[in-house]
From Swiss-Prot:
The UniProt record lists the keyword Iron-sulfur: no
Protein name in the entry: Terpinolene synthase, chloroplastic
Compartment(s) where it occurs, according to its Swiss-Prot or TrEMBL record: Plastid, Chloroplast
Any one GO cellular component localisation term in the record: chloroplast
Domain of life: Eukaryota
Gene: ag9
CC cofactor: Mg(2+); Mn(2+); K(+)
Pathway note: Terpene metabolism; oleoresin biosynthesis
The organism of origin for this protein: Abies grandis (Grand fir)
Similarity comment: family membership: Belongs to the terpene synthase family. Tpsd subfamily.
Gene3D superfamilies assigned: Farnesyl Diphosphate Synthase, Terpene synthase, N-terminal domain
Residue numbers covered by motif DDXXD motif: 381-385
Length: 630
């Protein structure tokens, strides 16, 4: 949401204290943002250890402002700069490369079918398990050709009833079919969810065939059924039934089986599923699971080699993460963000999110660009939400549209520094994107920013006038103000996938794929943040708008309705991501989708971006700050 303007800011009350060395000094990322030493009743406004309700304070000119006391930055620059790791040494890369060659040989041996370990009775499931393991371990980029060959082979035996464990299997089984369905659908093969109908109980509606005793083999089959059910398309009723059935079954199984690698796997799959499971976080979890595995299911595969590659790759990338994080922290410190006492500082968390989404070493531009854009819109969100006055916001929005450093002349001092950091950072990322795309990209970014700030101004007008919009009107504006286009568009353009204007339209606003993602993020954000927003005087949310249009409904009714909307929209996103009639490169759509997954991960229980809670700190630690034991 945007600002409540408690008192209008007159031209005489513009902050005049000079905190910036030179307004027109254009050295990249050198702009210093002022330390706003606001005082309320003689006390400095400082960070608290938790997020609290807004506090009204007055600046030196008597302008009342609202301050939300967010907890301070958890990862100071001294700590970040002190990080070290040995895994940047060439010997680790050389060891990983040797193992990659050996694993390519494992793929070849599976294809050879030696008649002893690999036979026509298990050749399909072994190919699927191999593909599933390398993907969950985050090392699949090394085996693209081998994966394609394995899946082409499996698909050649796919039929309307699914598949069995081998090419000579006479009967389809649930485990092979569910695992095969999931992997094939994710790789763009045409597979119908109707195959799952053949595994349902004839007499029990919504139930699937299972024995009275939960054997380990059966539990694994139902686990793969659950994983498959999460990539449902709209209208697939059998997928809904499969999700409900398998979730209940697996929760019961956890009560009955001993703590083991299987129970750990069930727990993390139920916890993060598909929509909130970021690639690097899944890799970290699966490394832990396989580290405890008794290896009985890997009789025909050398899992030790796969696991060692995964650990080496994880730690080698960890050394790159440290270098990038140090660069980001210096940018944050040198730009003066630490002096903004009214704003959240979550740049480390945003970098962790970016590096959980994109783990290719050559895409540093994506990770750093994503983290910087997220941090910038967080600061702007806090200004438009609480700190700025209406006149200041109008001035800033108008200055931004001019896109010229001289436009800062009329801005208050604290906005001048911020404007220049935004200006320089957007231009910096645009230059990198221009090289990747072979064309000018700044105008794409500027259009996204202008729409973003316009949506903030619309929300500011609602609040200042006390207007509560209709649900539809609210969503049209607020799905833009979430800022997805800002932190997704430019970083994606820095990647080495050429995106013409025509192709870009498939993943950018207002096309369906982008619109769905923006809607999901706004709806999920509101279910986690509406109480805190309301306490700060920001009434409009999807919850309050729904209740206005449905007299007599409760907050619980509204939240249930919104969650149902999100579930349906996610199915539509699945379809838009995986459908084969689009022209956009699947890798770009996948990155956009992974950004959605990462954002939803932060909203699983609460607003994990405003308040870096235990869960947030844990995944930052496990995916960025710590290596895995070899």
């Amino acid at each position: 949401m945007a600002l409540v303007s408690i008192l209008p800011l007159s031209s005489k009350s513009v902050l005049h204290k000079s905190w910036i060395v030179s307004t027109y000094e254009h050295k990249a990322i050198s702009r210093t943002i002022p330390n706003l030493g606001l005082r309320g009743r003689g006390k400095s406004v400082t960070h608290s250890l938790r997020m609290s309700l807004s506090t009204a304070v007055s600046d030196d000119h008597g302008v009342q402002r609202r301050i939300v006391e967010f907890h301070s930055n958890l990862w100071d620059d001294d700590f970040i700069q002190s990080l070290s790791t040995p895994y940047g040494a060439p010997s680790y890369r050389e060891r990983a490369d040797r193992l990659i060659v050996e694993v390519k040989g494992i793929f070849t041996s599976i294809s050879a079918e030696d008649g002893e370990l690999i036979t026509p009775l298990n050749d399909l499931i072994q190919r699927l398990l191999m593909v599933d393991n390398v993907e969950r371990l985050g090392i699949d980029r090394h085996f693209k050709n081998e994966i394609k060959a394995a899946l082409d082979y499996v698909y050649s035996y796919w039929n309307e009833k699914g598949i069995g464990s081998g090419s000579d299997s006479g009967v389809a089984d649930l485990n092979s079919t569910a695992l095969g369905f999931r992997i094939l659908r994710l790789h763009g093969y045409s597979v119908s969810s109707d195959v799952l109908e053949h595994f349902k109980e004839e007499k029990e509606k919504g139930q699937f065939v299972c024995s009275a005793i939960q054997t380990e083999e059966e539990i694994k089959s139902v686990l793969n059924l659950f994983r498959a059910s999460l990539i449902a398309f709209p209208g697939e009723k059998v997928m809904e039934e499969a999700e409900i059935f398998s979730k209940i079954y697996l929760k019961e199984a956890l009560q009955n089986i001993a703590v083991s690698s299987l129970s750990r796997e069930i727990e993390y799959v139920l916890e993060d599923g598909w929509q909130t499971n970021m690639p690097r976080l899944e890799t970290r979890n699966y490394i832990d699971v396989l580290g405890e595995n008794d290896r009985d299911e890997t009789l025909y595969m050398n899992m030790e080699k796969l696991l060692e590659i995964a650990k080496l790759e994880f730690n080698i990338f960890h050394s790159l993460q440290q270098r990038e994080l140090k660069d980001l922290s210096r940018w944050w410190k040198d730009s003066g963000f630490s002096h903004l006492t009214f704003s959240r500082h979550r740049h480390v968390e945003f970098y962790a999110l970016a590096s959980c989404i994109e783990t290719d070493r050559k895409h540093s531009g994506f990770r750093l660009g994503f983290a910087k854009m997220c941090h910038l819109i967080t600061v702007l969100d806090d200004i438009y939400d609480t700190f700025g006055t209406m006149e200041e916001l109008e001035l800033f929005t108008a200055a931004f549209k001019r896109w010229d450093p001289s436009a800062t002349d009329l801005l208050p001092e604290y906005m001048k520094g911020l404007y220049m950091v935004v200006y320089e950072t957007v231009n910096e990322i645009a230059r990198e994107a221009d090289k990747s795309q072979g064309r000018e990209t700044l105008n794409d970014a500027r259009r996204a920013w202008e729409a973003y700030l316009d949506s903030y101004m619309k929300e500011a007008e609602w609040i200042s006038s006390g207007y509560l919009p209709t649900f539809e009107e609210y969503m049209e504006t607020s799905k833009v103000s979430f800022g997805y286009r800002i932190f997704a568009l430019q970083p994606i353009l820095t990647m080495d996938v050429p995106l013409t204007h025509h192709i870009l339209q498939e993943i950018d606003f207002p096309l369906r794929f982008n619109d769905l993602i923006c809607s999901i993020l706004r709806l999920k954000n509101d279910t986690r943040c509406y109480k805190a927003d309301r306490a700060r005087g920001e009434e409009a949310s999807c919850i309050s708008c729904y209740m206005k249009e449905n007299p007599g409904s409760t907050e619980e009714d509204a939240i249930n309705h919104i969650n149902a909307m999100v579930n349906n929209l996610i199915k539509e996103v699945n379809w838009e991501l995986l459908r084969q009639d689009g022209t956009a490169h699947i890798a770009c759509k996948k990155h956009a989708f992974d950004i959605l997954k990462g954002s939803l991960h932060g909203y699983k229980y609460r607003d994990g971006f405003s308040v870096a809670n235990k869960e947030t700190k844990n995944w930052v630690r496990r995916t960025v700050l710590e290596s895995v034991p070899l």
